[in-house]
Amino acid sequence: MVGWAGNPSFDLFKLPEEHDEMRSAIRALAEKEIAPHAAEVDEKARFPEEALVALNSSGFNAVHIPEEYGGQGADSVATCIVIEEVARVDASASLIPAVNKLGTMGLILRGSEELKKQVLPALAAEGAMASYALSEREAGSDAASMRTRAKADGDHWILNGAKCWITNGGKSTWYTVMAVTDPDRGANGISAFMVHKDDEGFTVGPKERKLGIKGSPTTELYFENCRIPGDRIIGEPGTGFKTALATLDHTRPTIGAQAVGIAQGALDAAIAYTKDRKQFGESISTFQAVQFMLADMAMKVEAARLMVYSAAARAERGEPDLGFISAASKCFASDVAMEVTTDAVQLFGGAGYTTDFPVERFMRDAKITQIYEGTNQIQRVVMSRALLR
């Protein structure tokens, strides 16, 4: 009697071969060029220049840039894979490809062809970086209450105000900036602009001192009569808030991917350590309590990865109503990352609480994934509104 051998050609929930090849390539690069510097990057809170060089030279710094602008034209799932694999060894370095997408997605979705040609090739071929400026000190979750203003002045726009929590601030060449152009129209009076680091009246504040992702600078941005050309507006005046929300629908899965990578890195470290660590004359991986913790950790990571890839695939297809799945993928994956990294530290015992091992760094880095691109409480607001409308 011949047993059933399965149907190898059944490809539902199976990534295409080119995605697997990309994963292998970026994993090899991350382990060789990025991982050896991760602990020092964290300890010294310095930008991961080695990672930037490696990602730029291999084309992984901004894989999402369309081919017509000199990029690889990688789809949303492939972009998530790149971010995930870099985050598996260094969350700070993973913010290079992640924030390059965040800082350009509004332009890709709503910008003019001329503006795209001005900005995107610099990221694709010249190693430039981009950041996203939405939040302000008094306009965080309530982003529509922002106070930064933009006023038309002939063929230019004049920006005044300040933005905060800008990831990779001071390292980026281009910034997508949201500003109020019509104060009387609320959210419909907000517009989006591309600001260059050398624009008159634009300055970057000092770096924040943070719990985690210490290698990625977080700064304020200041606009003091910042003058930019009139064609640097993204879309029509008053459409900026819609552009901001559409951007987040496409980029929240990338934060989910970062969270999955952090969790996977912690899980990998925990598995290796529990196999090696001996107590009571045997490896602690033989103890059922440890086995159950590892099983739960792996189960959560796998579920988070599938949700992130599903959200990214739906975004790539251009499906409407991405709000729920994008928020869910970011929210679930980041909660998983916090749980898994905490359990990884627990499995290491006292050793996990020291900087001799990477799990404490993974745990500190995981926390931000529950906060940026909308706190997980806001993600639940987004999801519940989608369910109840």
From Swiss-Prot:
Catalytic activity from the UniProt record: a 2,3-saturated acyl-CoA + A = a 2,3-dehydroacyl-CoA + AH2
UniProt keyword terms in alphabetical order: FAD, Flavoprotein, Oxidoreductase
Organism domain of life: Bacteria
Record has Oxidoreductase as a keyword: yes
GO MF: acyl-CoA dehydrogenase activity; flavin adenine dinucleotide binding
EC number: 1.3.99.-
This protein's GO CC annotations: cytosol; peptidoglycan-based cell wall; plasma membrane
The keyword Secreted belongs to this UniProt entry's keyword annotation: no
Major enzyme class: oxidoreductase
Cofactor (UniProt): FAD
SUPFAM superfamilies: Acyl-CoA dehydrogenase C-terminal domain-like (SSF47203), Acyl-CoA dehydrogenase NM domain-like (SSF56645)
Membership in a protein family: Belongs to the acyl-CoA dehydrogenase family.
Protein name: Probable acyl-CoA dehydrogenase FadE25
Organism from which the protein derives: Mycobacterium tuberculosis (strain ATCC 25618 / H37Rv)
